[in-house]
Design a protein with these regions (language model features):
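Nucleic-acid endonuclease domains
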Residues: 2-188
Length: 188
């Protein structure tokens, strides 16, 4: 039985090459999230706090990046970042079905990020959208400005907040776009 992500079936196996002069072949059979002690039941992240969920998402994003052609991934620094093939990548996660990813409208993406990996933890296994950072910055700022204008220019309940969201429909086009991280894709 094939695992289901929020976007549809998740590949049963993925192969990739890693390493430099020493050739290494890695085959990941079913990149799935199984919590310790859960047998092989789907993810249940209910017992994790927000920091643990972000770490869980970040480590799965790192593994998926390697499985999809990236050669070097570092998990270090702030909880929302990875270094993939020398480029900073921001990781954002969600765990509630139907909920958007939460961001700041003023700074939706860290300044030095080349891309954002949106990790969807609402299905049986983690699923990923990989979007160019500048596209995310522009989209969030534009969407927030339009929303704010529709409210008369002032946020109704908390005027000082710049809290914004990224809805699934706004990033669906970046589903499984690992080529964005390698810089070989046209960023449409």
């Amino acid at each position: 039985m094939q695992a289901e992500g929020n976007f549809g079936p998740v590949p049963e196996s993925v192969a990739c090459e890693t390493g430099g002069p020493d050739f290494t072949y890695v085959r990941i059979t079913r990149l799935a999230a199984v919590m310790p002690g859960s047998g092989n039941r789907p993810m249940d992240l209910g017992g994790l706090n927000n920091h643990q969920v972000h770490d869980f998402a970040r480590f799965h994003a790192a593994a998926a990046a390697l499985a999809n052609g990236c050669r070097h991934v570092e998990v270090s620094g702030p909880q929302t970042r990875l270094t993939i093939d020398g480029r900073t990548v921001q990781v954002s996660s969600r765990r509630q079905p139907g909920s958007p990813w939460q961001v700041s409208a003023a700074h939706p993406v860290v300044d030095d990020a080349a891309a954002v990996i949106f990790v969807d933890l609402t299905g049986d296994v983690p699923d990923f959208c990989i979007a160019p950072a500048q596209r995310v910055r522009s989209d969030v700022k534009s969407h927030f400005a339009t929303w704010l204008e529709s409210r008369g220019g002032v946020r109704p309940r908390n005027p000082e907040s710049d809290h914004s969201t990224v809805e699934l429909d706004r990033i669906r086009q970046w589903h499984q776009r690992w080529d964005i991280l390698e810089g070989r894709a046209d960023e449409d």
